């Protein structure tokens, strides 16, 4: 069973190919942006549930009014709580990453990327590197840069028209992401995993982004998309469009690729791996409905299935998830 095969990422062995992707529960984040017991309980359930890689939900590198519903890594106050997360994830032999991000400027209702002062632009950049170092201090095996779903790094890559070296042509727009990868590696060491979640509705730029991540020293490609921007998927492709994007990246890179998108059964995940479309599968809603999805799937058991609500109720507020309520 390919799902149960180990995989090495930057020298770290992941015990199987199942990933719990970063998923925020906006009903549990406290105003202080710090880890609380509800987070510990949730991530312990995922790790105990058998996934090889657990990626902690998006954490902001700076505290801003627009990301008040996220965990925050702005200062060292975050380290004790984040250490509690790594402890419970590692307790069950899972690899622990944390997704770090800054909210997109369109969400922040501030100026466009090209209107940010150079001082602020470089301050944001430094905040990512500092956050990565705090995550390493807390015991994480690595970080994931969130460069998808309209977040700040995604906006820079896709829309920056700055007049300096970070805007205009693709080579300039990708520069910030590439420099972040290089600087985080320099700061945290070559064995610290740097993953990137990214996507692009432009086929050529999707592949060029993957190549730039690899060239900069990135270790893992987590392909996703959202905000209504998707690649055109050929008729007859049997899986989600995000998996199609991952398959294109997989065919053009040497780095391991994670795919995500409507993977609800072990048979689906196994088929994706056997067809060579990705190296790992991320199971989001399935893990929300049953945190033991990985363990049960690998044991040949049937997990409690996600009910596939049109709008994910767990995402809105976890206590409202009908699958959780039905237990």
Regions from the PLM with identified roles:
Residues 1-327:
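Flavin-dependent oxidoreductase catalytic cores
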């Amino acid at each position: 069973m390919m799902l149960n095969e180990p995989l090495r990422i930057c020298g770290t062995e992941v015990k199987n190919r199942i990933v719990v992707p970063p998923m925020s529960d906006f009903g549990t984040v406290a105003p202080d942006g710090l880890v609380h017991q509800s987070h510990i309980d949730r991530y312990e359930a995922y790790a105990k549930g058998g996934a090889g890689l657990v990626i902690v939900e998006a954490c902001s590198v700076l505290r801003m009014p627009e990301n008040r519903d996220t965990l925050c890594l702005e200062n060292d106050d975050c380290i004790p709580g984040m250490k509690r997360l790594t402890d419970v994830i590692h307790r069950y032999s899972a690899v622990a990453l944390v997704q770090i991000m800054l909210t997109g400027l369109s969400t922040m209702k501030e100026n466009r990327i090209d209107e940010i002062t150079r001082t602020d632009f470089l301050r944001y950049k430094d905040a990512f590197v500092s956050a990565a170092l705090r995550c390493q201090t807390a015991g994480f095996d690595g970080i994931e840069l969130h460069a998808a779903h309209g977040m700040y790094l995604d906006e820079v890559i896709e829309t920056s028209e700055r007049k300096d070296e970070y805007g205009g042509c693709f080579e300039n727009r990708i520069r910030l992401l590439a420099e972040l990868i290089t600087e985080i590696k320099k700061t945290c060491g070559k064995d610290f995993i740097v993953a990137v979640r990214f996507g692009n509705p432009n086929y050529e730029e999707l592949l060029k982004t993957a190549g730039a991540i690899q060239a900069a020293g990135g270790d893992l490609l987590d392909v996703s998309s959202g905000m209504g921007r998707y690649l055109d998927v050929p008729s007859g492709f049997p899986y989600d469009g995000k998996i199609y994007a991952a398959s294109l990246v997989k065919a053009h890179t040497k780095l391991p690729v994670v795919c995500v998108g409507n993977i609800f059964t072990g048979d689906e995940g196994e088929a994706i791996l056997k067809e060579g479309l990705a190296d790992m599968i991320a199971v989001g809603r399935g893990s929300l409905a049953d945190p033991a999805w990985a363990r049960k799937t690998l044991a040949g058991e049937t997990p409690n299935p996600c009910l596939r609500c049109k709008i994910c109720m767990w995402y809105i507020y976890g206590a409202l998830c009908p699958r959780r309520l039905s237990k």
